[in-house]
Amino acid sequence: MKNFSSFLFFSIACSILNAQVLVKGHVNDKVTNDGLPGVTVIADSKNGAITDINGNYSLRLPAGKHALEFRMLGYSAATRSIDLKTDSLILSVVLETAARSLDVVVVSAGKFEQKLGDVTVSMAVISPQLVENRNTTTMESIIDQVPGVNVTDGQANIRGGSGFTYGGGSRVLLLVDDLPLLSADAGDVKWNFLPIENLQQIEVLKGASSALFGASALNGVINIRTAYPTATPKSSVVMYSGIYDNPERPELKWWGDKNPGFRGTYFFHSRQIGQLDLVLGGNVYENDGYRQDELEKRYRFNINTRYRFKRIQGLSAGINTNFMDVAGGNFLLWDGANQGAYRPLGGSSQQYDNIRFNVDPFLTYFTKSEGRHSLRTRYYYTLNTNDTKQRSQGKLYYAEYQYQKHFKNGLTWTTGLTGTYSEIASQLYSQHYSSNESGYTQFDKKFFNRLTVSLGLRAESYKIDTAQTTFYLRNGKDTIGKLPVQPVMRLGANYQVAKATYVRASFGQGYRFPSVAEKYIKTAVSGLEIYPNKKLGPEKGWSAELGVKQGFQVSGFRGFLDVAAFRMEYRDMMEFTFGQWGNPNTDPLFGIGFKSTNIGHTQITGIDIALEGEGKIGPVGIRLMGGYTYMNPISLDFNPAVDTIKNSSLQNILKYRYRQLGKGDIEISYKKFCIGFSMRGNDFMENIDRFFVDPFYSHVLPGIAEYRRRFHHGDVVFDSRISYQLNEMVKVSLVTNNLFNHETTSRPADVMPPRNFAIQFSMKF
């Protein structure tokens, strides 16, 4: 009997210890008190749940002590400690809109929601408030404000990874809601097509990311995430009107008494209609152009929809679309360094009328076992027409299936397949077809609640007409076989040393196949010939970094300081290069012109420092973003006897790069007033093609050598803004760009805008 009693007592004790306790509750927005659907709830970095349409969640946990973490994009993560007995527990949580701290939730680093402090690579996050407050008219200008990033003639460049490419190809992959949005023909970013009116946040991932995102992520990723509605409908309208000031040098002014200006309106509306999420957005913009004939008129409209099925829990489907018609003049090169700086070479600009639209059907299903199936597709159409018979049409079809699983041991597994098919018909490069298939898998695991490890693998295959990916299997110097796929991998680790101190290390490989434009374009621009290169091959590379992120808090102000040392190497790097590529007897200028070539083995090393923060010190609100980047971009195949003949510099430095970049933005608010300042700085661009400064060719492109001798220092440009909140709905702002009217160029023969002023009215209701 005694043994039986002991056995019974032991059995009851085990049952109590292993009992599964029901934990449930709801998650609300702190300001609106709306329930938040789609919040990820994680227990002890292992088990998880996702809130439903009303923000409700439930999960079962063993009795005892646990830590629950609540994560959602656009909000700061919240953590709650609980001690479960044998009864159920009701735990409700409110989430605050994310400030610039380590708790900001991001997605791009691993295709699932993580705290910024946990990611294994360098990342920057831009809030929609900064985009609006700076009176951003195209996404290009706000990306140019990110530390370590600059945009040269429409080409995004992270840590010196790219130079001047005449709009062909991109080493930075642009995503909109996790789907690539590069044009089918040129493989470039259409910045004015991106929806500034509908933003959740912008995530910039620095370093090679091809293992998770594929080709064109060789230098990094920019992910623009749009917003979905909450239970409370939201609407906003922003209207602005601006004018260009006279340039610092009077001789640059080409207009009469009436200065050119710009004006625009954009709107946003979101609401839930039963199970349907609906978002509407639109943008109208008109610019007279500070450069002669460089007009722009554009109209953009977008719709996002998502339907959440009641009968099938976890299933949602929708269609997102964006349409734009834009017309204007395309300024490429100046007509001289003085009176001609704001006038196009030859006296006139190419006039264009372009159409762009994308349609994105998608399907998502969350399983009861914490898995997620998603099918995302995109049709992206671009039509470029102009008055120089250079019509181009591109059709891109994209599909991605992805499965993601959160395991109870803290492991997150993400795997998927992608396929892309493109059709291009153009007067510039005839008719071509391209395809891209890939498969990827990534494992993210958290150990001891401090160490995060990430491993990703991808196999990529690309084909343009008959040219395709080839990977050679080697045994030493001997080739033993070849495959039609290129494997790439990434590995990263992040260790939380202290409460707000994180140390990380990462290594990632990259691979990029040339675009149709880079291989096949044949045209003339302002008297300069651009030649095709059918033998242009793919480029490969890798990047590595070692970084530390230190969080801090001063009163109610929270932020972090991030320092990273990085190194990137590229083999067969593609660059836009000047030389004698044509027939010297029949082609203009004896066959001299530009084309994309593989320049060999290159290396970029440096250090990237970023400082971000947001909060209040007493009654004063402060929002801060800034950084400094030092880069040393060199060729590992540098031959002084040959390269110094082609380059303007005698030093070993890659063309069209800076060694130093500085960025800063600070915004201070008090009661109804808000004032902000931005800064962008760089040193002198040491190396360009010698053609631009050679006296022998000065009749083709006049004034560049003279201009570089005169403006041989770096540049620092400041912007300012001041706003007043008239009431709960209406705000009025005065925005001044290039505050001190400093004259700058982004590349040879391309002078940037003079000082300009804009008045902005914004209404939210």
What are these language model-derived features?
Residues N28-V31, V39-I42, R71-Y75, K85-E132:
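Short, acidic, small-residue-rich periplasmic hinge/interaction motif at the N-terminus
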Residues N287-N302, R306-H373, Y379-Y398, E743:
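Flexible loop and strand-edge segments within Gram-negative outer membrane beta-barrel domains
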